[in-house]
Amino acid sequence: MIDEIKAQLDSHQKVMESVKGELAPKIAAVADLLVDALGNGKKLLVMGNGGSAADAQHFAAEIVGRFKMERRGLPAIALTTDTSILTAIGNDYGFEQIFRRQIEALACEGDVVVGISTSGTSKNVHGALLLADQVGCRTIGLLGKDGGTIREIVDVDLTVSCDDTPRVQEGHITIIHIICDLLEKRLFG
């Protein structure tokens, strides 16, 4: 059992080294996008499925509440939280439309839309990001594996190049925390 624990921690460390080596400039670019958008009255919309839905909620909570600094709240919405909206859209239009319909209703030009997908192929995230681009939003993918089809359609992809979903999720939440830290320091530091 101890060997398995050490192997998992080694795997985690390898992913973090990859994130540090490959994604630092892109993380900075995303922080810049968010500083610009939120500093100019725009909002953040975040979505994902399963564990990525939880990450979307976590991201929005850090933006609306706070990460480390006492500051005013900033506008962010996790498109994963309203069960009435999700089930109404899912029932009437299908699961692939649950985020797209919300983008149609809530997104404005200049907003930032983040799609989180450990596979990079979530159809409901993909469709919503396409619409967000048409609306004039900046689009970001927090992705895994090779980035899948979503990597090709976003303005900035933060792809954690790993096939192990738990390690990808660990990379995603670390990236989210770094972005929140940079954002607060730039806007309020």
Curated annotation (Swiss-Prot):
An annotated GO cellular component: cytoplasm
Compartments, record wording: Cytoplasm
Binding of Zn(2+), residues: 58, 62, 169, 177
Residues in SIS domain copies: 34-189
Binding residue positions for substrate: 49-51, 62, 91-92, 117-119, 122, 169
GO molecular function: carbohydrate derivative binding; D-sedoheptulose 7-phosphate isomerase activity; zinc ion binding
Keywords associated with the record: Carbohydrate metabolism, Cytoplasm, Isomerase, Metal-binding, Zinc
Gene Ontology annotations of biological process type: carbohydrate metabolic process; D-glycero-D-manno-heptose 7-phosphate biosynthetic process
Cofactor note: Binds 1 zinc ion per subunit.
SUPFAM superfamilies recorded: SIS domain
Cofactor(s) of this protein: Zn(2+)
Disulfide cysteine pairs (residue numbers): none
Family the UniProt entry places it in: Belongs to the SIS family. GmhA subfamily.
Protein name: Phosphoheptose isomerase
